[in-house]
């Protein structure tokens, strides 16, 4: 007769096979796992319930730890929406721009648009929620390369966000505008929809970040089509010098430094520092890597490994100090080697 450890190892093996198949951190009830495996994994802390019938892969001892949820958030949104709406859904224009800008912040409320959306809030874990808004889908939907969720194209999202977005989310808006290489896609969308007011906002936005060629092209072409386009700057702060980036991460770092440098520079000690105790100073550097490792622990979703299954099967898995210390030691060692 199989021992409890062997039964748990069997369930973990089934879970691992699911993860290996589609790299999923999300389980939808008994459609993917038998009730026996599901209950066993849930009881032992390997699955955490998000909604009735919906689970994310967790680990024992992670109860109350938000890391597992936030690292699984977009996987859950994708799996949940795909199950409810097939491919007929997309993140809101605002959240689409968050994804285009490389933002890693998880919104408290995830707004998705779907023709079959119910216009009601579904509460998720740790104060987050999803709001499926009933509405027409954009002309084109693309996959976010990082999370796989459905998003607006960059150009269509910029056109469709509200004017207040450029004030309330200035950094994201500027990053996304800076990634636009030419006016062709935006012009086609504006002209096809006769969007003269939005065209004026796009002209002002591109001129604000120094992309006068795109701004002039939109203005000239739309007026040539007979539209009464009036340029309006949607930003409140003074205009920028020319911003053009190929990577959202490059744009984010550059713009954040530009915004914060005046506050940071006075805090930097520029005076020459003479180190009398060289040995003590080097010892202090050796200690710093531990703090760096602690504050930089990975928040990737939890993956089941063959080694872990074998430890559980043999009864050697203990979600206590020993296993946690082993993990932290490996992480600290990796950061130490990088620190060198």
Residue ranges and their predicted role:
Residues 118-120, 125-128:
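Surface-facing alpha-helical segments and adjacent helix-coil boundary elements at the starts of domains
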Residues 42, 101, 163-167, 194, ...:
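Hydrophobic/aromatic-lined pockets within catalytic cores
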Residues 2-88, 127:
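Short beta-edge/loop segments at beta->alpha junctions of small alpha/beta modules
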Residues 1-5, 138-263, 274-283, 324, ...:
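Hydrophobic alpha-helical interaction segments
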Residues 38, 50-53, 81-120:
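Short helix-loop-helix/strand-helix junction enriched in hydrophobic and basic residues
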Residues 96, 158, 293, 335:
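A residue-level signal for conserved active-site and pocket-lining positions in enzyme catalytic cores
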Residues 226-235, 272, 279-283, 295-340:
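Active-site core of Fic-domain adenylyltransferases
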Residues 92-95, 101-113, 254, 266-285:
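Extended, Lys/Arg-enriched charged tracts that mediate electrostatic binding to polyanionic substrates
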């Amino acid at each position: 007769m199989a021992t409890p450890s062997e039964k748990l190892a069997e369930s973990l093996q089934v879970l691992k096979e699911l993860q290996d198949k589609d790299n999923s951190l999300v389980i939808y009830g008994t459609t993917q796992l038998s009730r026996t495996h599901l209950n066993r994994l849930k009881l032992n802390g390997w699955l955490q319930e998000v909604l009735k019938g919906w689970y994310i892969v967790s680990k024992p001892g992670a109860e109350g730890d938000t890391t597992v949820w936030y690292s699984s958030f977009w996987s859950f949104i994708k799996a949940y929406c795909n199950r409810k709406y097939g491919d007929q859904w997309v993140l809101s224009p605002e959240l689409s721009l968050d994804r285009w800008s490389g933002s890693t912040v998880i919104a408290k409320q995830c707004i998705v648009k779907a023709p079959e959306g119910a216009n009601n809030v579904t509460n998720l874990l740790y104060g987050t929620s999803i709001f499926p808004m009933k509405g027409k889908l954009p002309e084109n939907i693309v996959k976010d390369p990082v999370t796989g969720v459905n998003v607006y194209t960059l150009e269509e999202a910029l056109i469709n966000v509200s004017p207040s977005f450029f004030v309330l989310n200035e950094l994201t808006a500027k990053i996304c505008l800076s990634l636009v290489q030419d006016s062709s896609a935006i012009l086609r969308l504006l002209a096809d929809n006769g969007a003269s007011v939005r065209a004026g906002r796009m002209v002002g936005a591109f001129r604000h970040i120094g992309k006068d060629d795109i701004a002039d092209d939109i203005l000239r072409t739309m007026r040539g089509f007979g539209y009464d386009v009036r340029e309006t700057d949607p930003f409140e702060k003074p205009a920028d010098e020319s911003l053009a980036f190929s990577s959202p991460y490059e744009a984010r770092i550059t713009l954040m430094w530009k915004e914060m440098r005046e506050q940071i520079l006075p805090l930097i000690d520029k005076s020459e520092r003479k180190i009398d105790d060289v040995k003590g100073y080097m010892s202090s550097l050796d200690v710093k890597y531990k703090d760096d490792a602690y504050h930089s622990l990975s928040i990737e979703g939890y993956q089941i490994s063959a080694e872990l299954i074998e430890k559980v099967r043999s009864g050697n898995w203990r979600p206590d100090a020993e296993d946690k210390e082993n993990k932290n030691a490996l992480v600290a060692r990796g950061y130490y080697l990088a620190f060198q």
